[in-house]
């Protein structure tokens, strides 16, 4: 973790003292994690408090996404096996996050499990000793996506995932790129767009197969070899990601990581089964 000034250390202490007084927040959150919240909010203490509270609140109210997620458990291994994931730094203190699906039939794809994997892997990266980034770029490779995805989609989880990504994660998200976008991508995008703020939709860029438009936003050499770059392949990056998960397995398997168990007045308030599209048939 980067060295910080005395003023920033004081802000970290203030954020920790405040968090420890809140009954709905976990106690004694690590300084390195609190620093990431401050940095992502450009050291605005009040905004950091709001972001941290939402981060913990979503986690506490979403047991289907943040519990029972041992990376070595059969359900998680099954979900991880059809994905290649990457997270690495490029010049300018920028970080690239890449999600690549490898399941052409979508037979093994589960939207809820995919969201759970996202939470798990981003937690592992938050726990790693990384530099404080200037901005984050997300690349999603949808080469294996088909209209069958609609039958896998889950409205409730999509709402939580969008809220978490937009307002709760301690990152400086600046760009989202959808590569190998099929002709019907607009139909899939229409499912997700209602849950996104305009600020996020303005960040999204679509790139058709074999196009070179992604290079307008990131230098070709800074991409994995899968995309014509000089970096490692996605398979190699994914191996690094799996090794990181294994090294953090004990803490990631803790169901109380940055969560405070809370009871909902409405028993079904946070059920991820509500709004599922699984009953639809796609020809």
Residue ranges and their predicted role:
Residues 1-283:
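Basic, amphipathic alpha-helical/coil surface patches used to engage anionic, phosphate-bearing ligands
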């Amino acid at each position: 973790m980067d060295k910080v000034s005395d003023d920033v250390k004081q802000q970290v202490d203030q954020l920790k003292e405040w968090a420890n007084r809140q009954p709905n927040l976990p106690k004694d959150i690590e300084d390195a994690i609190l620093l990431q919240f401050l940095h992502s909010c450009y050291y605005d203490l009040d905004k950091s408090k709001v972001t941290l509270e939402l981060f913990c609140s979503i986690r506490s109210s979403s047991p289907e996404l943040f519990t029972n997620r041992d990376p070595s458990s059969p359900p998680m291994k099954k979900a991880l096996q059809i994905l290649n994931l990457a997270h690495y730094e490029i010049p300018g203190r920028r970080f690239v996050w890449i999600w690549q699906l490898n399941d052409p039939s979508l037979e093994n794809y589960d939207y809820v499990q995919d969201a759970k994997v996202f939470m798990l892997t981003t937690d592992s990266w938050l726990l790693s000793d990384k530099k404080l980034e200037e901005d984050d770029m997300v690349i999603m490779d949808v080469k294996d996506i088909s209209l069958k995805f609609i039958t896998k989609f889950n409205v409730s989880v999509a709402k939580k995932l969008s809220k978490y990504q937009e307002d709760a994660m301690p990152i400086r998200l600046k760009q989202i790129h959808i590569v190998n976008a099929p002709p019907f991508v607009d139909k899939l995008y229409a499912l997700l767009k209602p849950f996104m703020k305009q600020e996020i939709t303005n960040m999204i860029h679509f790139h058709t197969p074999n196009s070179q438009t992604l290079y307008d936003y990131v230098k070709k050499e800074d991409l994995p070899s899968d995309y014509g770059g000089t970096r490692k392949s996605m398979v190699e990056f994914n191996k690094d990601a799996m090794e990181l998960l294994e090294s953090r397995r004990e803490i990631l398997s803790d169901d109380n990581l940055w969560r405070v168990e809370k009871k909902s007045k409405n028993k079904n308030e946070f059920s991820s089964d509500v709004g599922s599209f699984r009953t639809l048939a796609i020809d």
